[in-house]
Amino acid sequence: MTARPHLASLWLAASLVMPLAAHARDAGANTFYGVGAQYDTTHVYVAPDDVDKFVASFLATFGGQSTKQVVATVTPTPSSTTSQLLQTPVGTVSLFGFKTPIPYPFGAERTGYLVTDIDAAVRAAQAAGADVLVSTFPDPIGRDVVIQWPGGVNMQLYWHTTKPNYATFETIPENRVYLSTERADAFTRSFLRFSHGKVVSDDPRAPGIEIGRVEDSFRRIRIESVFGKMTVLATDGHLPFPYGREMTGYEVKDLNDTLAKARASGATVLVEPFASDHQQSAMVQFPGGYVAEIHAAAK
């Protein structure tokens, strides 16, 4: 007879605790780990001999400045690279010129996203469907991890020991992700769950001129989140060069003026300007091989 009041009290305690636990899980699921688009960088790897040429051309094209170049180990296994940030009004590049062979899988990650709590961010990414390719490791200024989203999209998350303070962009660049038609939905769901972003548009018949195939169409998904803009291009993989090689699209005020600066600084215009989706776009290759999409609003 004395067991019943005891069981009742346990049930009451559990009923009070369970909603709190559920609330804690929900709060964790809704935590924003991103900081802002100005803290997200495109990772660019060039040969050491091309580093200075790339820096000069990229900054001459977009403006901005470089941080001091350092030589460091930025991988968990032994390696050596020059490292610097190119900070422009339209996007930031993390530039690496490896003096040693590049340890796997470095060089395949597209971007680096600053997060407020790297351990919690990794757990959130895994819960959203990402794999951890390189577990968290220290670097000279913080900690890093390399993850992979459904569809094979590699990304680095990083955290700084000293909180950085960067100026906001004049225009926010777009992370351009090429995926198979079969994996586009899985990637989008996974990334949205992690980033708490939103789909701005989902066009199942976007103009094929945007991927170099004038007579065809493809699916284009535009996403916005605290990490900035992302464009998912779901295709059959039949892409003429250089489509699929670019990782970032940079928005500028005057496309023709920007292309003139690019040419004058040693870059090559691979695709001349074309009009689509209310903007003018072109493709440029900088010294060292980095390919970028550049666009401006149609006038």
Regions found by a protein language model. Give the residues of each.
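Boundary at the C-terminal end of the N-terminal hydrophobic targeting segment
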Residues: 22-29
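A cross-kingdom feature marking solvent-exposed beta-strand/loop segments within repeated
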Residues: 69-82, 94-119, 126-144, 162-166, ...
